[in-house]
């Protein structure tokens, strides 16, 4: 009996404790099953020690740990600590992959090749970010390519959320060695459709939870922009 007890003590002492990510996330808190598909947290690390975390639920960027001007590692995007918080708050959009069409489509209607399509209305009579079940609310298939990249794929079927055409999607998140998060979007379709993919991360470069961004200055290097109307 004593030998058995000693073995149990030895096993408990040598049992490896789960390590948190740099941002304090536990990978086990993202292991679940949603919509009949497995979810997980994928951790990307570059040669400088920076880190980005992505979950395949909604293809969401959960955290980005990069050094500030003093070299202190800081999480600069908003995100939840576990998968259940994302599932319970799907339309907060934190870090989500947005599609089939980012932003609003007025009155949820558009015409293509002489056919008018009606989309679900989820924002004051308009269709926002592909509707209430956009790509930020689905489980993507995921494959970690290497330490710095994860590849997400999803088939958006013809008629999903009212959009025409089967759309095969591949999105690759890469944490580069200059501490940038590179997001590459690829999509192919079998019939004319509309596509406008983006990411919906909320940035706070101060890294202080609960702080505002009113002292941030933003500059966008763009040659053109699309003006908006009252809708």
Name every feature range the model reports, one short phrase each.
Residues 1-4:
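Sec-dependent signal peptide recognition
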Residues 9-12:
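C-terminal motif of bacterial Sec signal peptides marking the signal peptidase cleavage site
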Residues 14-50, 56-231:
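An exposed, glycine/acidic-rich loop-and-rim segment of catalytic or binding clefts
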């Amino acid at each position: 009996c004593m030998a058995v007890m000693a073995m149990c003590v030895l096993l408990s002492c040598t049992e490896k404790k789960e390590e948190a990510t740099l941002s304090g996330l536990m990978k086990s808190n993202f292991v679940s099953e949603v919509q009949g598909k497995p979810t997980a947290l994928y951790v990307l690390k570059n040669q400088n020690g920076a880190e980005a975390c992505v979950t395949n639920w909604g293809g969401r960027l959960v955290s980005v740990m990069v050094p500030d001007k003093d070299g202190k590692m800081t999480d600069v995007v908003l995100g939840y600590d576990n998968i259940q918080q994302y599932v319970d708050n799907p339309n907060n959009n934190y870090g989500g992959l947005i599609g089939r069409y980012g932003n609003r489509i007025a009155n949820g209607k558009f015409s293509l090749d002489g056919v008018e399509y009606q989309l679900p209305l989820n924002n004051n009579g308009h269709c926002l970010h592909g509707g209430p079940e956009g790509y930020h609310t689905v489980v993507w298939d995921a494959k970690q390519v290497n330490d710095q990249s994860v590849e997400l794929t999803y088939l958006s079927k013809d008629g999903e959320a009212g959009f025409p055409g089967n759309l095969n999607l591949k999105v690759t998140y890469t944490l580069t060695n200059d501490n940038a998060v590179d997001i590459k979007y690829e999509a192919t379709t079998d019939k004319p459709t509309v596509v406008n993919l983006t990411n919906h991360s909320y940035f706070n470069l101060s890294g202080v939870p609960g702080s505002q961004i009113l002292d941030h200055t933003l500059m966008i290097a763009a040659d053109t922009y699309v003006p908006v109307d009252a809708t």
